[in-house]
Amino acid sequence: MAGSIYGKLFRVSTWGESHGKGVGVVVDGCPAGLELSEEDIQVYLNRRKPGQSRFTTPRKEDDRVEILSGVFEGKTTGTPISMVVMNYTQRSGDYSEIAGYYRPGHADYTFDVKYGFRDYRGGGRSSARETIARVAAGAIAAKLLKQFGIEILTYTKAIGPVEIDYQRFDRNEIQKNALAMPDAEAAAQAEVYLESVMKGHDSSGGMAECIVTGVPAGIGEPVFDKLDANLAKAIVSIGAVKGFEIGDGMAVAKAIGSENNDGFVMKDGTVAKLSNHAGGTLGGISDGAPLVIRAAFKPTPSILHEQSTVNKSGEDITVSIKGRHDPIVVPRAVVVVEAMAALTLIDLLFENMTARLDKIREFYGIEETEK
């Protein structure tokens, strides 16, 4: 199976299935000398861990990470960093019934068509549990970005029809409520909404928003490797994501040029923007303003509602999906969005080191010898 490797210079290779022995990742390209511990990784993994509230799957997993290589005496060595998280509470018997049919909204059918075989126990590689590896690698990328003054804040912007009010935005609320919303009032409304959805044996979609500050101007490559194009690929690669926006996103289709353009001004000796409709990029290159991206997540497809599908014999049948499932994925997925943004940014930041000859000379302490 191709498609499990991401990045050029900061390169991650993920492996494992939801109901296998574990999931893991190998990170290649992390510079030597970064202070790194398992606890640095665990902080991020705890944010996506299941079983933390009534709005997540009741499957209980400690999701304890173990660093197998690439770290010595508390610092990265510059060699590949291998990490693993073992699975302990998988109940594959919950999925034996679905071996003979395709679950609506899942990748069962497409995996079967492509490979002629599928791991029906929780979806295999298409399971959300695959994102553990992304988060572990993203934790390292985020720590590297902090060395350059780049910070990432990700939270739940909307759950179903309930959206946060930026007038009540409080980043401290993100860790206080079960839905990772920076608005206590909206979080309370969203809980009521989710309770009604769950009583109807249904699930809800939602939206995550990610703000990246401290990104210097000049990150990203023109044409096919634009910063926003890479971010879009990274975010949409997350299993349940069906939409991506940067800046004003889809709203630009209804705007006029005088509304949409961000004016420039000199501020403290540098070029700054008067607004940020573009979301931090111009021409696929960072412009120094905060990156503002959003990801739309579909409702969890595993629901107790009766749904139409077909079995492997080609017969039409009706099914309802039993098992342990999230009624909404966004609160646990915000850290996955954060991880993929971090992986994209650190990779492009490293790539940008080769963009200018004068900067390469400066790095190596070489004087210019000829024009």
Place the predicted regions along the sequence by residue.
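N-terminal, positively charged regions that mediate nucleic acid binding
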Residues: 1-59
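A short glycine/serine-rich beta->alpha loop
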Residues: 11-14, 119-130, 217-221, 276-281, ...
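Glycine-rich anion/phosphate-binding loop at the beta-strand->alpha-helix junction
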Residues: 21, 201-316
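Alpha-helical support elements that line or immediately flank enzyme active sites
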Residues: 21-33, 129-150, 225, 229-233, ...
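Glycine-rich, N-terminal phosphate-binding loop and its surrounding beta-alpha-beta segment
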Residues: 45-104, 108
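Short acidic, glycine/tyrosine-flanked loop/strand segments centered on an H-E-D-like triad
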Residues: 99-124, 307-325
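Glycine-rich, mobile lid/loop segments that gate access to catalytic sites or pores
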Residues: 113-223
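Internal helix-turn-beta structural module
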Residues: 302-371
